[in-house]
Amino acid sequence: MIIFNLSSYNPGPFILVGIPGLEQFHVWIGIPFCIIYIVAVVGNCILLYLIVVEHSLHEPMFFFLSMLAMTDLILSTAGVPKALSIFWLGAREITFPGCLTQMFFLHYNFVLDSAILMAMAFDHYVAICSPLRYTTILTPKTIIKSAMGISFRSFCIILPDVFLLTCLPFCRTRIIPHTYCEHIGVAQLACADISINFWYGFCVPIMTVISDVILIAVSYAHILCAVFGLPSQDACQKALGTCGSHVCVILMFYTPAFFSILAHRFGHNVSRTFHIMFANLYIVIPPALNPMVYGVKTKQIRDKVILLFSKGTG
């Protein structure tokens, strides 16, 4: 049944359809989503625990890594539990405030993730290009200011999205063909001009993320120049190994993100079912893989994980 809203600026609940075209498979689709979500939660919680309790991990790089783990937890938790309730319980309704809250945390943590990866790139740049000045440049005070700065920047970028939606009148169907609320998807249900919503909601966050990518690329260009200028091959391999996990996480974050964004904007031949499925995988797979990547590629974390589980079985 099509649900219409006649209350203009005070809309009733929205209906989240799930994954269009695959409704009959929702119960089965929920199983791998649940497993991957549990892996993401457990992996990031272990990572946070190790960074907090192990004094040897109280370094700038691991501080930013703990921020990444926290944002990954929030990102996946903002979307996956509601998706599972749709898949398994048929709980499709979401209130307008609940929709805005979910949208804010999903978009906020996406932009914050990008900023954290940029900060981690700068950390690697200082560690490799100016190792003797590392502790004087990245002081605890500087790290805290950087963390607060990127968090506040992300907040300021995403908060207008919420405000713009609250200014729209809704007098059309309130059915959203998705498993979670996202800015443009909700704005398209309004019976008013959404040009501002489109240009701000699409262009500003994307330009912000692109600027982060450019700064990351510049940092790694300097890093590569410094690495290939090292006198010994062992030192070169060690320096590249230090950056390996970060590069893997960068590729896992930005590659599907830009693919999803471009497919949504220009991929008119991409089916809605594929796009929604891909968007759901994006909020759960990178958060699940990031702890594994750092656990495998970062010796300090790998050793602490082995020690933790050896104590548990001993």
From Swiss-Prot:
SUPFAM superfamilies reported for this sequence: Family A G protein-coupled receptor-like
Subcellular compartments: Membrane
Cytoplasmic compartment residues: 54-59, 123-149, 219-242, 297-314
Disulfide bonds: 99-181
Tagged with keyword Transmembrane helix: yes
Alphabetized InterPro entries for the sequence: GPCR_Rhodpsn (IPR000276), GPCR_Rhodpsn_7TM (IPR017452), Olfact_rcpt (IPR000725), OR51/52/56-like (IPR050402)
Residue ranges that the UniProt entry lists as topological domain Extracellular: 1-32, 81-101, 171-197, 264-275
Glycoprotein found in the keyword field: yes
Annotated membrane topology: Multi-pass membrane protein
Glycan-bearing residues: 5, 269
GO terms, molecular function: G protein-coupled receptor activity; olfactory receptor activity
Keyword set, alphabetical order: Disulfide bond, G-protein coupled receptor, Glycoprotein, Membrane, Olfaction, Receptor, Sensory transduction, Transducer, Transmembrane, Transmembrane helix
Pfam family, one: 7tm_4
PANTHER family with a match to the protein in the record: OLFACTORY RECEPTOR 52H1 (PTHR26450:SF123), OLFACTORY RECEPTOR 56B1-RELATED (PTHR26450)
Family designation: Belongs to the G-protein coupled receptor 1 family.
Functional note: Odorant receptor.
Name recorded for this polypeptide: Olfactory receptor 52H1
Lineage: Eukaryota, Metazoa, Chordata, Craniata, Vertebrata
Gene: OR52H1
